[in-house]
């Protein structure tokens, strides 16, 4: 959530910044009308509260003198009814203003390139050289399906489209990748391993920005009066650990990692990536989340992105690093780097990690704060999140980049300890 002062004091300037950087149309007329009404009702509410307090004091004094207080009591009762109505009206207006605020995306950092979509993202670096094959390259489905290692048909029978059953050595490869990533981030990068719930409440989804705007992309469960959401990423529970908390400065930065299932309805994906495991309703990811002081967030962003890069480098997977333009960034981010891994079957780079600095946007929604030793007062944290990395897409990249002419797959050196020393699949 943006600073409410921006909405109240500079709505026109804010609207122009949102339009030019995010393509977001802020209804300033509605906003200004509601804000004017809020001020009017708030002033009247405060007047009534003051009158009630003064009359209540007068009643106490009159009673002490033994005077008749019936008239005063009737007057206060009248104030009470009007005050209750005024307070209720104020709550309604505040809820409307909050609803508007919750639907406004974050403002990009000054050093984010302007652009309308992914075609205007800016490549920052490349690592590794894509392998030149002397045989016809197969995609991950052609490599895995004939052996029954990737089974979309059975998954469709069980659950429908965009699910996959993994078996045998490919299931083991998938597990090995997740374990490798966790061990790397915990052992070498200093993140605390965390096991989080896969079902969260609406407050958690609002805190990180999935609600209210992206409800159609979430899977929900309802049991009786209890409604919960399946997490689209463990960013949600990890980041919400600091919700409604004041963190001591000595504990910062908080660096957390989790390996979890993720669930996405993919409501806006249409017919994209319907083949294989590129875009699934259920997938696994190793997530990185950091909560830190504002002055450290840019350095933590660079550090987090580097941690994700190391995963790909240790696996020997060529990739490129891209700085997203204003029109391609996520709702909550002020700045985002994507890492895109080389897929030989597509002869292109595909996203495998997205690392975002959200500034104080999520922290304001969550009331996540730290105690600044310089002032002694609670101040908003900065939060960051990144994929370290998507496990299924890493598996696809390993299968395709390490394939042989006979359809077998070499196991990267970094994964062999997790595969019982196995050097080749197939």
UniProtKB/Swiss-Prot annotation:
GO terms for biological process: selenocysteine biosynthetic process; seryl-tRNA aminoacylation. ATP binds at residues 264-266, 351-354. PROSITE patterns: AA_TRNA_LIGASE_II. Pathway: Aminoacyl-tRNA biosynthesis; selenocysteinyl-tRNA(Sec) biosynthesis; L-seryl-tRNA(Sec) from L-serine and tRNA(Sec): step 1/1. It catalyses: tRNA(Ser) + L-serine + ATP = L-seryl-tRNA(Ser) + AMP + diphosphate + H(+); tRNA(Sec) + L-serine + ATP = L-seryl-tRNA(Sec) + AMP + diphosphate + H(+). It is an enzyme of class 6 (ligase). Its EC number is 6.1.1.11. It is found in: Cytoplasm. L-serine binds at residues 233-235, 287, 387. InterPro entries: aa-tRNA-synt_IIb (IPR002314), aa-tRNA-synth_II (IPR006195), aa-tRNA-synth_II/BPL/LPL (IPR045864), Ser-tRNA-ligase_type_1 (IPR002317), Ser-tRNA-synth_1_N (IPR015866), SerRS_1_N_sf (IPR042103), SerRS_core (IPR033729), tRNA-bd_arm (IPR010978). NCBIfam families: serS. Homodimer. The tRNA molecule binds across the dimer. Catalyzes the attachment of serine to tRNA(Ser). Is also able to aminoacylate tRNA(Sec) with serine, to form the misacylated tRNA L-seryl-tRNA(Sec), which will be further converted into selenocysteinyl-tRNA(Sec). This is Serine--tRNA ligase. The lineage of its organism: Bacteria, Pseudomonadati, Pseudomonadota, Gammaproteobacteria, Lysobacterales.
């Amino acid at each position: 959530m943006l600073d409410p002062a921006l909405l109240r004091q500079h709505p026109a300037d804010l609207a122009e910044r949102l339009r030019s950087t995010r393509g977001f149309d802020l209804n300033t007329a509605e906003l200004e009308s509601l804000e004017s009404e809020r001020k009017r009702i708030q002033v009247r509410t405060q007047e009534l509260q003051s009158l009630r307090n003064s009359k209540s004091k007068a009643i106490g004094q009159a009673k002490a003198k033994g005077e008749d207080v019936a008239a005063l009591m009737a007057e206060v009762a009248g104030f009470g009814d009007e005050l209750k109505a005024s307070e209720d009206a104020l709550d309604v207006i505040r809820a409307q203003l909050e609803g508007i605020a919750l639907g406004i995306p974050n403002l990009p950092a000054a050093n984010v390139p302007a652009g309308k979509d992914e075609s205007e993202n800016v490549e920052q670096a490349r690592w590794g050289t894509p392998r030149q094959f002397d045989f016809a390259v197969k995609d991950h489905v052609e490599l895995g399906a004939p052996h029954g290692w990737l089974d979309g048909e059975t998954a469709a029978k069980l659950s429908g489209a965009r699910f996959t059953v993994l078996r045998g050595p490919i299931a083991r490869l998938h597990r090995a990748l997740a374990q490798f990533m966790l061990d790397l981030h915990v052992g070498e990068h200093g993140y605390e391993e965390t096991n989080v719930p896969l079902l969260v409440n609406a407050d958690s989804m609002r805190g990180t920005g999935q609600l209210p705007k992206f409800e159609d992309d979430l899977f929900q469960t309802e049991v009786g009066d209890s409604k919960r959401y399946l997490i689209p990423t463990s960013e949600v529970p990890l980041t919400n650990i600091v919700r409604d908390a004041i963190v001591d400065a000595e504990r910062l930065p908080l660096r957390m990692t989790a390996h979890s299932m993720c669930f996405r309805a993919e409501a806006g994906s249409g017919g994209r990536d319907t083949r294989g495991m590129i875009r699934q309703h259920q997938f696994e990811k190793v997530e990185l989340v950091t909560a830190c002081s504002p002055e450290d967030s840019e350095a933590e962003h660079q550090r987090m992105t580097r941690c994700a890069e190391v995963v790909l480098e240790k696996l020997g997977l060529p990739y490129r690093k891209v700085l997203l333009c204003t029109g391609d960034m996520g709702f909550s981010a002020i700045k985002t780097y994507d890492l895109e891994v080389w897929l030989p079957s597509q002869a292109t780079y595909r996203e495998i990690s997205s690392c975002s600095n959200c500034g104080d946007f999520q922290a304001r929604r969550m009331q996540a704060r730290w105690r600044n030793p310089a002032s002694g007062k609670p101040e908003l944290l900065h939060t960051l999140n990144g994929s370290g990395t998507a496990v299924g897409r890493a598996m696809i990249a390993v299968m395709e980049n390490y394939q042989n002419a006979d359809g077998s797959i070499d196991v990267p050196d970094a994964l062999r300890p997790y595969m019982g020393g196995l050097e080749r699949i197939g």
